[in-house]
Every structure is written in structure tokens, then in C-alpha cells.
Amino acid sequence: MAALLAAGAMAVGGVTPAAAAGGLLPHPGPDGLVWVEDMVGDGGVASGGAWDRLPTVLTVACEGGGAAHVTMDSQGYRVADFTVDCPTGTPGTGSVTLDPGVVRTGSFTIGVDASDDTVRWALTVTQPE
């Protein structure tokens, strides 16, 4: 499991401008597998359609004070695990890029554990070609 986490390059932290119309992250476009536009508190998503021959990028933005702990599982393996600081007033972002083959073909799940029920977050999963 540690080898899978080490296979991806992770960049967590930073601040990003809010997306159009007050969203935390813009729509991911044609490379997008998942877009969770706006959630508050704990949550997550399950999806299918991942392909193991492309890199996978998971990006989370949040605000409201506190933090969001993010995990991603693919076919029974934990492939990402990171925490994003969620400042008040300006969104914080965290992102992980997983090499081809780390996310396996088929379904995956992402969990977001917010430190407070008022933490607002959004996420995208893309597989750029």
C-alpha cells in the first residue's frame, strides 16, 4: 500500500481563486471523471470509469476554517491520503497526481472527512490524456 502512495506525486496546500459563480473549483472539462461542485461537512463520492493507462489527478478545495482529510481507494487499495487546510474567506487547495497504473481500471471511492460541519468543499478527478 505504501508503494502505491509513493508512486504518486503529491502537492498539498496553497490558495486558489474561486471558480466562476462562487464555486470552489471549476468544471474539469473533457478530462473529468468526477466533479463535486459544492458540499458541506463530511461526504464523498463513488465512481466508475477510471482507466489504468492514464495519470489520475484528485484536487480538493475547501474553506470555512478547519481542514478536510481526503482519502481515495481504487479496487480495494488506498491510493491517496492527504489533508487540506481550509482557511476562512479564501479557499485552500490540495492535489495529488497518481501515475498511470496506481488507479486501477474501474471503480474508485473518495472520502472527505471535514473537521467541522461548516467546512465547505469541492473536488475534481481528472485523467488528462
What are these regions (language model features)?
Residues 66-82, 123-126:
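Short, surface-exposed beta-strand/strand-loop-strand elements in extracellular ectodomains
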Residues 31-38, 78-89:
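Solvent-exposed serine/threonine-rich low-complexity stretches and specific carbohydrate-binding patches
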Residues 1-20:
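Secretory targeting and sorting signals
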Residues 51-73:
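N-terminal, post-signal-peptide region of Sec/Tat-exported proteins
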Residues 53-59, 99-125, 129:
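Noncatalytic modules at the cell exterior or secretory-pathway interfaces
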Residues 16-49, 128:
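Transition segment at domain starts
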Residues 44-49, 87-105, 126-128:
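Beta-sandwich interaction modules
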